[in-house]
A protein has these predicted regions:
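Mature extracellular/secreted ectodomains of secretory-pathway proteins
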Residues: 93-228, 232-246
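N-terminal secretory signal peptides that target proteins for export/translocation
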Residues: 1-19
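Sec-dependent signal peptide recognition
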Residues: 22-27
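Structural motif marking the loop-to-transmembrane transition
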Residues: 13, 17-21, 137, 213
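Long, compositionally biased low-complexity regions that are usually intrinsically disordered
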Residues: 37-38, 245-255
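N-terminal Sec/ER secretory leader and immediately downstream segment
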Residues: 37-140
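C-terminal motif of bacterial Sec signal peptides marking the signal peptidase cleavage site
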Residues: 32-35
Length: 255
């Protein structure tokens, strides 16, 4: 941003400079633009990754949806790690030797569309409230994250990667964002019969504040809302383009 600001400043100076000064400024502009082009991006940015053959079959919206899905699932797995650290008794219920192995089981079940034995036939929204209720006896952290992950994938038509032939429903994505907000509230407020949280998460005390769980949920919701807007705009533009083609009755060249 600072680099481009300097470019714009030098460009404006050319309007008022003499011929010799304009030549000097032109040289400076070339050098500065070269520096702008060579400036590295944030290492965490997906724009630095190499293009893959699959991207030839993806529209801009498909790419946004694919990247958003990956980031959202990764955010859920980070939440799972945090929750296991604060609630170690939960991963032990799964029979796994440690939290990492317990987490791998949940991740595999989410991405391979496999059911969790302790949830029976429940998945996505049917499993959400159940995992934070008195009748659930399994790993609450794993069950909760599995429910959220399967809900996300269901809202995206059962897929995690998207291509030109795929049609995402903006309303389902919007609903998934609202479900995430409700899940965040349930996590913070659902308590057992003794008044204790089913799962320890956000904390505000005299020792300090830990709102990292709410922040992670907020990022997921923001990405889902952005995708909803992108899908709505894509559909609107398709309708406008079709109407324009009818209005102007443009014929296509045949030679």
């Amino acid at each position: 941003m600072a680099c481009m600001t300097r470019v714009l400043f030098l460009s404006s100076l050319r309007l008022f400079a003499g011929r010799g000064m304009r030549a000097c400024i032109a040289v400076l502009l070339v050098l500065l633009l070269a520096g702008c082009v060579g400036s590295p991006f944030d290492a965490s940015s997906d724009s630095e990754s190499e293009a893959t053959p699959d991207e030839l079959f993806q529209t801009h919206t498909d790419r946004v949806a694919t990247l958003g899905m990956r980031k959202n699932l990764d955010a859920l797995y980070r939440l799972m790690e945090k929750l296991y650290r604060r609630n170690p008794a939960e991963w032990r219920k799964s029979g796994a030797p440690n939290a990492q192995v317990a987490g791998q089981r949940i991740r595999w079940a989410v991405e391979q569309h496999q059911p969790l034995r302790e949830l029976g036939s429940r998945s996505d929204i049917a499993a959400l409230a159940f995992t934070l209720g008195p009748d659930y006896r399994g790993d609450r952290v794993g069950g909760f994250i599995y429910a959220l992950g399967s809900m996300l994938i269901t809202a995206h038509d059962g897929q995690t990667t998207f291509y030109m032939t795929d049609m995402l429903n903006a309303q389902y994505i919007h609903n998934a964002a609202r479900n995430m907000e409700k899940a965040s509230w349930l996590l913070a407020n659902r308590k057992d019969p003794h008044g204790r949280p089913w799962l320890l998460s956000n904390e505000m005390s005299v020792q300090g504040q830990n709102l990292s769980y709410a922040i992670e949920f907020g990022k997921i919701v923001a990405r889902l809302d952005l995708l909803t807007e992108v899908l709505d705009e894509s559909g609107r533009r398709m309708g406008v383009s079709y109407a324009q083609s009818l209005l102007f009755m443009n014929f296509l060249p045949v030679q």
